């Protein structure tokens, strides 16, 4: 899950 990935976590929190 990219949303839970530290590297792509920003995308999930940018919601």
Curated annotation (Swiss-Prot):
Location (main, coarse): secreted
Family per similarity comment: Belongs to the FARP (FMRF amide related peptide) family.
Protein name per its UniProtKB record: Extended FMRFamide-12
Single GO biological process annotation from the record: neuropeptide signaling pathway
Functional summary from the UniProt entry: FMRFamides and FMRFamide-like peptides are neuropeptides.
Cell location: Secreted
Source superkingdom: Eukaryota
GO cellular component: extracellular region
